[in-house]
């Protein structure tokens, strides 16, 4: 079952293509995936049943983040890059290579054009990877026909079959000029970088001619060839047309908050994304300029060869300081990348606002719902009390404080209650009177602020005792309500008003959830304090039974050793070091 945090983020997912990064409890990326529709895909992990590896993956996810792209193909390419960079544990299939083809122009005297699954630092040109394997293979065949290089083993003394077919420049029987290869490689690179308009126009005309001449099989082949080319060389913003290392900064501002995205492009790939959110004091352009300078002032952040920024940034000033060209993209692929980064900036900030809104409903909004149900003005502070004891022995009380719907643990208080013969047994009335008087008489004495509402864990007895002390002994008019549980010991309702009427809250409301959290928290705090006290009392009673151990010696032992086990393990010499006589020290050792 998804956590509340994940449920909130699932509700905010965009129905756009992109990549998602799943994180574990240590904020480590354990899985990277892509999706045509992030909303549907990511939700499926938490809204469907799974088995095997997927079930194990989902059980370890505590958070996720997304990066939106313009197309599904861009998401695919980014996914491969992120997997190769982060090596997530659950991406087993893609850990060794991508599993998808690249088109490669080899770095040889007589270069070849071929398909490969691995990218190596061998001086060759690589294009891809391509999600449509068959389309990539067909495009390779097309290129080998239109822009031939070497297609045989070479140097075999006679022309090969491909030379006769016009698909090899003839390295098989002659020395091919390097300029011939260079010219062909330029054409291939332009083609694979998306400059295919002339080729597509030519194929379209040939297809139309074939159809007019009723050569339908030929027309279908040309149609398929067009589709393969479009699938292979579709414009890709994730892959840039040069290998210049560059960083790209984009921002989005709303409601006084600035969202910044940083894209790191290396080896023609978007290899990393960073995001930052903070309040904006100056103009967003000034804030971004300052942020960029601070970013590269950190010792681990290396300057790239080029920095891309949105319009309105003082580029010359930044460039003079950083000694790096700083540019604003005006058209083409870089501008498209900037727009994609700006879109991510906007979505991140919108997610923050909506999560804050949801959190506000759960805290401040929930507290307001409780106050509304009781007919009280909205306040900030709720204090809740609960008692704990075993058949009246070692009675304690605990108080928890919630401010604007959030637990403030530094304001929690614990009370050891008076235990007398007159108060033997579970005397909830006396326990309530004592703790309420002690708490609020002290606040009055110290001149501190009073809460807006007091909640008593219990029924009519606790409620009336608290009201009586406040009104008749302390002269205070703090509203008091009783938290009532059902037969299953679950939060059920509130008791409030002169007639102690029952106030029901909608069990599905945030106010009811907050009331449950308060009741559970004060109960937990009281129980833990009582157990702690019982443990100390048990330890003290064992020491009291030892001859020669009085209150002072007992206090020394407890203060220095902390537990019965440590006292038992201590040597006679260690006990004597506390000022205990050797005889008493030996008696302690024998008794324990």
Swiss-Prot record:
Residues in GIY-YIG domain copies: 15-92
Plastid is among the record's keywords: no
Gene3D superfamilies for the chain: 5' to 3' exonuclease, C-terminal subdomain, GIY-YIG endonuclease, UVR domain, UvrC, RNAse H endonuclease domain
Keyword Kinase applies: no
Keywords: Cytoplasm, DNA damage, DNA excision, DNA repair, Excision nuclease, SOS response
Domain UVR: 197-232
UniProt-listed SMART domains: GIYc
UniProt feature coiled coil, ranges: none
Subcellular localization: Cytoplasm
GO cellular component: cytoplasm; excinuclease repair complex
Record-level Gene Ontology MF annotations: DNA binding; excinuclease ABC activity
Matching InterPro entries: GIY-YIG_endonuc (IPR000305), GIY-YIG_endonuc_sf (IPR035901), GIY-YIG_UvrC_Cho (IPR047296), RuvA_2-like (IPR010994), UVR_dom (IPR001943), UVR_dom_sf (IPR036876), UvrABC_protein_C (IPR050066), UvrC (IPR004791)
Pfam family, one: UvrC_RNaseH_dom
GO biological process, one term: SOS response
Entries under SUPFAM superfamilies matching the protein: C-terminal UvrC-binding domain of UvrB (SSF46600), GIY-YIG endonuclease (SSF82771), RuvA domain 2-like (SSF47781)
PANTHER family: UVRABC SYSTEM PROTEIN C, UVRC/OXIDOREDUCTASE
Role description: The UvrABC repair system catalyzes the recognition and processing of DNA lesions. UvrC both incises the 5' and 3' sides of the lesion. The N-terminal half is responsible for the 3' incision and the C-terminal half is responsible for the 5' incision.
Assembly, per entry: Interacts with UvrB in an incision complex.
Similarity comment text for this entry: Belongs to the UvrC family.
Protein name, as recorded: UvrABC system protein C
Source species of the chain: Latilactobacillus sakei subsp. sakei (strain 23K) (Lactobacillus sakei subsp. sakei)
């Amino acid at each position: 079952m998804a956590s509340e945090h994940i449920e909130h983020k699932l509700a905010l997912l965009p129905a756009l293509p992109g990549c998602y990064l799943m994180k574990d409890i240590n904020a480590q990326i354990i899985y990277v995936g892509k999706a045509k529709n992030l909303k549907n895909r990511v939700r499926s992990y938490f809204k469907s049943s799974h088995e095997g590896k997927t079930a194990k993956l989902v059980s370890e996810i505590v958070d996720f983040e997304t990066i939106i792209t313009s197309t599904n193909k861009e998401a695919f390419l980014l996914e491969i890059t992120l997997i190769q960079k982060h090596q997530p544990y659950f991406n087993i299939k893609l850990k060794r290579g991508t599993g998808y083809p690249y088109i490669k122009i080899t770095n040889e005297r007589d270069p070849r054009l071929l398909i490969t699954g691995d990218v190596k630092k061998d001086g060759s040109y690589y294009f891809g990877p391509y999600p449509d394997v068959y389309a990539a293979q067909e495009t390779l065949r097309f290129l080998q026909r239109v822009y031939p290089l070497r297609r045989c083993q070479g140097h075999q003394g006679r022309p090969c079959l491909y030379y006769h077919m016009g698909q090899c420049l003839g390295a098989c029987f002659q020395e091919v000029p390097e300029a011939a290869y260079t010219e062909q490689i330029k054409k291939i690179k332009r083609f694979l970088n998306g400059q295919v308009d002339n080729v597509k126009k030519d194929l379209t005309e040939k297809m139309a001619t074939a159809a007019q001449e009723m050569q339908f099989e030929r027309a279908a082949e040309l149609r398929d060839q067009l589709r393969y080319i479009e699938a292979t060389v579709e414009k890709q913003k994730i892959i840039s047309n040069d290998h210049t290392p560059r960083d790209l900064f984009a921002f989005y501002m709303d409601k006084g908050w600035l969202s910044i995205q940083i894209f790191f492009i290396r080896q023609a790939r978007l290899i990393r994304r960073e995001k930052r959110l903070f309040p904006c004091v100056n103009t967003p352009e000034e804030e971004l300029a300052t942020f960029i300078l601070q970013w590269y002032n950190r010792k681990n952040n290396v300057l790239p060869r080029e920095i891309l920024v949105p319009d309105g940034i003082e580029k010359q000033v930044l460039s003079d300081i950083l000694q790096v060209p700083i540019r604003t993209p005006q058209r083409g692929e870089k501008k498209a990348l900037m727009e994609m980064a700006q879109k991510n900036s906007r979505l991140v900030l919108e997610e923050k606002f909506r999560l804050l809104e949801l959190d506000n409903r759960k805290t401040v909004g929930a507290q307001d719902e409780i106050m509304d149900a009781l007919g009280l003005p909205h306040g900030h502070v709720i204090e809740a009390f609960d008692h704990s004891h075993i058949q009246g022995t070692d009675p304690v009380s605990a108080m928890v404080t919630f401010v604007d719907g959030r637990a403030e643990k530094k304001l929690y208080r614990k009370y050891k209650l008076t235990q007398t013969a007159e108060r033997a047994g579970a005397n909830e009335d006396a326990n309530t009177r004592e703790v309420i008087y002690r708490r609020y008489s002290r606040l009055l004495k110290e001149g501190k602020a009073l809460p807006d509402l007091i909640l008593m864990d219990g029924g009519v007895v606790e409620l009336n005792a608290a009201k009586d002390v406040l009104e008749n002994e302390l002269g205070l008019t703090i509203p008091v309500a009783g938290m009532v549980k059902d037969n299953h010991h679950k939060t059920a309702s509130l008791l409030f008003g002169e007639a102690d009427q029952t106030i029901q809250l909608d069990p599905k409301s945030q106010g009811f959830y907050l009331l449950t959290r308060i009741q559970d928290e004060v109960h937990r705090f009281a129980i833990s304090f009582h157990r702690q006290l019982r443990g100390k009392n048990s330890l003290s009673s064992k020491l009291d039974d030892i001859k020669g151990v009085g209150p002072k010696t007992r206090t020394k032992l407890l203060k220095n050793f902390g537990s019965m086990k440590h006292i038992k393990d201590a040597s006679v010499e260690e006990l004597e070091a506390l000022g205990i006589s050797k005889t008493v020290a030996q008696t302690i050792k024998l008794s324990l």
